[in-house]
Curated annotation (Swiss-Prot):
Location within or outside the cell: Cell membrane; Cell projection, Dendrite; Cytoplasm
TM spans (from-to): none
Originating organism: Mus musculus (Mouse)
Name the UniProt record assigns to this protein: MAP/microtubule affinity-regulating kinase 3
Activity control mechanisms: Activated by phosphorylation on Thr-211. Inhibited by phosphorylation on Thr-564.
Active-site annotation: 178
Broad class of the protein's primary localization: membrane
Role summary: Serine/threonine-protein kinase. Involved in the specific phosphorylation of microtubule-associated proteins for MAP2 and MAP4. Phosphorylates the microtubule-associated protein MAPT/TAU. Phosphorylates CDC25C on 'Ser-216'. Regulates localization and activity of some histone deacetylases by mediating phosphorylation of HDAC7, promoting subsequent interaction between HDAC7 and 14-3-3 and export from the nucleus. Regulates localization and activity of MITF by mediating its phosphorylation, promoting subsequent interaction between MITF and 14-3-3 and retention in the cytosol.
Amino acid sequence: MSTRTPLPTVNERDTENHISHGDGRQEVTSRTGRSGARCRNSIASCADEQPHIGNYRLLKTIGKGNFAKVKLARHILTGREVAIKIIDKTQLNPTSLQKLFREVRIMKILNHPNIVKLFEVIETEKTLYLIMEYASGGEVFDYLVAHGRMKEKEARAKFRQIVSAVQYCHQKRIVHRDLKAENLLLDADMNIKIADFGFSNEFTVGSKLDTFCGSPPYAAPELFQGKKYDGPEVDVWSLGVILYTLVSGSLPFDGQNLKELRERVLRGKYRIPFYMSTDCENLLKRFLVLNPVKRGTLEQIMKDRWINAGHEEDELKPFVEPELDISDQKRIDIMVGMGYSQEEIQESLSKMKYDEITATYLLLGRKSAELDASDSSSSSNLSLAKVRPNSDLSNSTGQSPHHKGQRSVSSSQKQRRYSDHAGPAIPSVVAYPKRSQTSTADSDLKEDGIPSRKSSSSAVGGKGIAPASPMLGNAGNPNKADIPERKKSPAVPSSNTASGGMTRRNTYVCSERCAADRHSVIQNGKENSAIPDERTPVASTHSISSATTPDRIRFPRGTASRSTFHGQPRERRTATYNGPPASPSLSHEATPLSQTRSRGSTNLFSKLTSKLTRRNMSFRFIKRLPTEYERNGRYEGSSRNVSSEQKDENREAKPRSLRFTWSMKTTSSMDPSDMMREIRKVLDANNCDYEQRERFLLFCVHGDGHAENLVQWEMEVCKLPRLSLNGVRFKRISGTSIAFKNIASKIANELKL
């Protein structure tokens, strides 16, 4: 694959001194002096100019916020992919720093198969690096936008995992406080991973918390009322909103502005879709209770009839954290071969230092999908789950009773989850490299060499997802997701594809210092409260196709939303760091709930609207730049002379195979090169700028530079092996859902495939 030349509009300015040198803060990390290992072998061969952080080779930016960015990276010693959250500490005030360190401390003590795992912490004088699981399956939010509501069987499988993970947090006296569809990630096997603990806090029974934080549509009524709370009950309310969202594809409480939303939440009335089962409705009534004292606990909800339907012999129970497995001799032997001594390995693991040794040990316990693929795979492919398309339907042994009804997966996929096996999934034939003794100061990080785009991600960065933590020893995930037959269905044609029916929600926090502002909003929110009790269901008008999903409430309201994607970049909707900036009342740059919202009569409201409407989108393309394929004479239809070697290379190049098909807008039996030629023709006809990033991947831009109508997206021709067809994958990078829907549907309809 030829080297990509990023468009100027998405170039990223250099990051200041992202090199692991200097002593880290002891409360955050304990590092050895050899965190700068460079690649020296076939697993991670690289040129000197490639940027590194510690033992990690940076691949591309997958998330970006005010004070942080998230990069996809590969661990040089093991070849595993990770997400690295890079936080600029110099931009944070003391309060924000304190919350950042609290987030790190909380992530260190969490060890659940459905919670994103922290591997390593590297700290310099100016920068903090959090190395975490990489999310290859994306967000539940994006799944719902692309696929519509889940069937209750599928929703139950996901929700059991969510409840198990949140209850585990509560039993460790941790409250998340920002549970929403955007912070629920999917790993390669479509299992849930909860991410983004930036708003989490430790609670004590008998003590009250008083910080209002989270996303308003998911926030409990007591938060809108400015009341103090114990902690777990606000998560329980958010789980009720999530359950409703999974089953219906829409929010139970919504409004065109914050005041309207607040009134609907405080009224506590929501529409029950006709297709929702009685058991599911009854479960919702245990979550969405206005009085927090009467709201159900997760221990009680785990015994609910709907939760355990189909799992009668294996009722959902509180997760029992297994003893830490720090004595796996197979992994230790591999690390000794890398150059680590037995003594330093034991010291690091016994103290759980979260240094390079801890990270290497943890990563060795994970089967890397990338090892199954060619090392020459493009970095674009790294953003998706690279699993073999074929499925061994016979490999279904060794699963817990929770796996009944789950789709079978190939043996390579099952090796991905260490907790599903009696031992870590360590390839026996892989020759692991030896660590380098080179200091990190020798490897200056030059991020301008990485194609980067305005993108988003949650705390995990690709909100970093991988399977269950190897620290779980032999304990299997008791809540592994049931994947319904939906995943095996043919790709949906353009005319039937569900699209952007949901609008991304922003998270913010009111600190104690803005209590007066919050009270003002609450009091003023009582004015003009003549709002109908029930919303009339309206078919979504935001489908890519003319056929809409009839059972989904109209979700978007023209919001200039900015989305969070894993594995695929998109403009950031919130700061990757999840703590408040200099403003005492806001923690994120966010987007107004609606473009038509009032400009705010209160201090908090004005802060929200003024702070949240800023855009860094003041650019446009005047002329499409020549792509690499055009410059090298490899542009289809070009009359330039092309060498026979180049022709052979083009002829042998094949589209990437996709395991899932919900992002497909159209399918065709046409030759992939002919499909690319047709796509370029339609893009030119619609005045779209584009760049050919790879053989079958285009990065596209449309609009006049204003935030309301500027859209960036990817179009890729992919192979659908199960259907023996090729498809066109659309992936929104930035811009509003409405603007993307308009241009994407126009292009899809004009394609003659």
